[in-house]
Amino acid sequence: SYYELLRDHISNFTEESLQYLSQEAGFSLLESRVINRDTIEFVLQKEAKENLSIFRYSGQKIDISPLLENEKEIQEDIEAHIAKLKEKGERIAIWGASHQGLTLLSTTALKEVVSYIIDSAPFKQGLYSPASHVLIVPPEHFQEEPVDEILIVAPGYTDEIAGIIKRDFQPCPRILALRGERITEL
């Protein structure tokens, strides 16, 4: 998804470009895998220059048009969802002051309607999100300022967070998650 291409990170890599960079820095690749659908994990070992293999990428340049299409689809889905919220006079919060959530807030119309960001990490609470300037609050804040729905934007923790909301939030708001390029109700 486009929201994984982080504007606040200095570099984003493909497996091939990261392998090339690692070898240029004097490391050999022992193991490579993709975790959480989009994070490249490498196990590297420092090598003497003469022991390094030469990496040559023979593939094609990367076509980013699917990434751009994904961004467009997410933008359109979010705008349609916001229109329905406004029509009903309802309020939304998001759960997750993560890179995905902060990217979505800073690049979509969500920043105009989100009441607050819930995050259970104490070091984030009381701060404001970059670019969108939305307050980050602890989960207990919901009891002081209930919203009609919560959009979970912490993909690795969606089920866990949904369970917390169902267990602890009364009245229970609608629980949503961004799956692919669509907002879905859980």
Predicted features by range, described:
Residues 38-42:
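Short hydrophobic/aromatic beta-strand or adjacent loop that forms the aromatic wall/cage
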Residues 1-11, 15-17:
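Short, glycine-/aromatic-enriched active-site segment of Class I SAM-dependent methyltransferases
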Residues 12-29:
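Conserved short secondary-structure elements within globular domains
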Residues 43-186:
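Hydrophobic, well-ordered beta-alpha structural blocks that scaffold small-molecule cofactor pockets
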Residues 11, 33, 71:
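Aromatic-acidic/polar surface patches that form glycan- and anion
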Residues 4-5, 20-23, 44, 183-186:
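Extracellular glycan-modifying ectodomains
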Residues 12, 29-31, 43, 93-94:
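Structured core elements
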